[in-house]
Regions:
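Short, aromatic- and cysteine-enriched interfacial helices/patches
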Residues: 2, 21-23, 170
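Solvent-exposed loop/turn segments at secondary-structure junctions
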Residues: 43-46, 76-79, 110-115, 146-149
Length: 171
């Protein structure tokens, strides 16, 4: 009986481990006494304004860390849809530099939806990048993906991902 309990515990533990994933390819410790700008995230999903929603959540988590943060999130996804990703990012960098930021926080949303079916579980996947505006180098790049239970909202799942990603680059 004890062996059966251990086996079931192991299997259920593996199930819960598989529900989220954080990948960090480039670890960085960035100073918290510099000025950061956050722009809208590029939206690869079919969900309208997912890039704006993800950026807004990341903005709140970063602000909680006491970072000086300039918001470039404009609440209008139409501008992003009318240009290429490169033009979108170039424009965000230019605005951030003009406002005196040292770093730009940006990213992409790969998934932002509720699964179909009875449970309707939220599924979120997005990446966060920090770009040094003086050198134009990407100093931090990580992606998080997570699904939640049917009683969680997409916003809660997105916030959980942000809480796991943000401390990885703020001193």
């Amino acid at each position: 009986m004890l062996k059966l309990f251990k086996f079931l515990f192991l299997i259920s533990s593996l199930y819960f481990i598989g529900c989220s994933s954080i990948v960090n390819k480039k670890n960085a410790q960035l100073p918290n006494n510099k000025t950061y700008a956050i722009g809208s995230f590029w939206n690869y999903t079919e969900t309208p304004m997912a890039g704006l929603r993800a950026a807004s959540i990341v903005e709140s988590v970063v602000a909680k860390e006491g970072i000086q943060l300039l918001s470039l999130i404009d609440g209008d996804e139409k501008n992003a849809l009318s240009q290429s990703k490169l033009a979108f990012l170039t424009a965000e960098k230019a605005v951030a530099k003009t406002k005196g930021a040292n770093y730009l926080i940006t990213g992409e949303v790969q998934e932002w939806r509720y699964k179909t079916g009875i449970d309707g579980e939220p599924v979120v996947s997005y990446s966060v990048k920090v770009i040094d505006l003086n050198t134009n180098n990407t100093l931090f790049n990580a992606v998080g993906a997570k699904s939640g239970w049917g009683n969680k909202s997409i916003g809660v799942v997105a916030q959980e991902i942000a809480k796991e990603l943000i401390p990885q680059f703020i001193n």
